[in-house]
Amino acid sequence: QRQMCIRDSFLPTNDRGGASSIPQEWRERTTILLGYVPPDQLKTFPNLKWVQSWNAGVDPYLAPGVLPGGVRLTSAVGAYGPAVSEHMLAMLLAIYKRLPAYRDQQRAHIWADLGPVGSLAGKTVLVGGAGDIGRHFARLVRALGAQRVIGLRRSAGCTVEGFDEIYGLGA
């Protein structure tokens, strides 16, 4: 369930459409929005002062004419790096060490060797995304011995901490 902060009250919304279920009288009283509101709906809040996005990326809000004048926009950049990158590492290691297959065998009371398992030591790791989450993940795999860490991002031409190389997606 998503919540949008409406002045002194919280109005829960269940639809991913954000503000579509908010009555007009609430829209007129709203000064702060928290969560996801489709950019094209921002103009329906005449007294809006601040939008706090749960997303790190807020590019859709930055297009000309989307954000009403004087409205402050903040994002969740930096909020998810450690937790999400640790989860990514856990999933990578589970797959690399064949933990799902061994779990399935254990449930079936089968104790067969599935062959050697690998290590990140000395390997090259490709990371899709070189933002906050990608940088945290790069540090984690490097700490486990990855020899090289390569990052993909929208555009190349810059260095990013924790990565040996950065390539652009050519969008």
PLM features: what roles do these ranges have?
Residues P116-A171:
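Rossmann-like dinucleotide/phosphate-binding beta-alpha-beta segment
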Residues R7-S20:
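A short beta-strand-loop structural module common to alpha/beta enzyme folds
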